[in-house]
Regions:
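Intrinsically disordered, low-complexity regulatory regions
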Residues: 1-96
Length: 96
């Protein structure tokens, strides 16, 4: 089995779970644009981990909206990204 076949099989599996890549990309980019515009309009300077967590949360929300909303892993990942930032803030640590 070739690498191309393996990749195509993987992509087909992902599409059945998350919907089309194009649909996901559209939703994800709209969410990210709104978040980044809102932060900029309010002069919010977020730390790199906060920005990345928000981007990853937007990615997971897009997967939920474009694909299977009952796939628990997406919801768990959202909680995980938020928890990573919250733990760093609660410890009083500065972002790297």
């Amino acid at each position: 089995m070739s690498n191309t076949t393996n990749v195509n099989e993987m992509l087909a599996g992902r599409e059945s779970r998350y919907g089309s890549f194009q649909g996901h990309a559209e939703i994800s980019q709209v969410i990210k644009q709104v978040m980044h515009s809102a932060a900029k309009a309010r002069n919010k300077e977020l730390d790199s981990d906060q920005l990345e967590a928000l981007d990853m949360i937007a990615h997971k929300i897009a997967r939920i909206l474009n694909g299977d909303p009952n796939y628990a892993d997406n919801w768990i990942d959202i909680a995980g990204y938020a928890t990573l930032v919250a733990n760093r803030i609660e410890k009083g640590e500065n972002a790297a």
